[in-house]
Amino acid sequence: YGDTYEAFVVMDADNLVAPNYLSVINQAFDAGYLVCTSYRNSKNFDSSWISSAYATWFMREAKFLNNARMMMGTSCAISGSGWMVSARIVKGMHGWDFHTLTEDIQFSTFCCAHNIQIGYAPAEFFDEQPLTFKASWIQRLRWTKGFYQVFFSYGTDLLKGIVKGQFA
């Protein structure tokens, strides 16, 4: 792969995308971003207070973190699905080599450690969120384990980058 396509979009099988999703995220690609995240909205906002809390968190993440970082010229962060990566990056790595429980965080950290700036595009997609506290708790335990996998793999590289003043 990579010889036919300019970029890949990573989605979960049950994600839904807005009709203009690809054209909006492609604008960021055309602007030079080799990696770009987008706006995750909830498919089931009104199903429970848990799913509503997730949707509110994702709005905050998109508007006040990633959009603000984009406006300031600093790197954004990938979170879950709904993001694009240039085929040049995948080809340059000789394939996809991110297999932790939180490969999104792992790839974001890799980008930061290698001075690859992640952009943000307001391309909207919809993701189903947990409905119960128990389901949310189990998901967050998995995320925590994945975070530590990434930390122990990239912590030294990130500290070296901070010392050198490199911030993607």
Identify the residue ranges that each predicted region occupies.
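Short beta-strand-to-loop acidic/aromatic patch adjacent to the donor-nucleotide binding site
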Residues: T4-L16
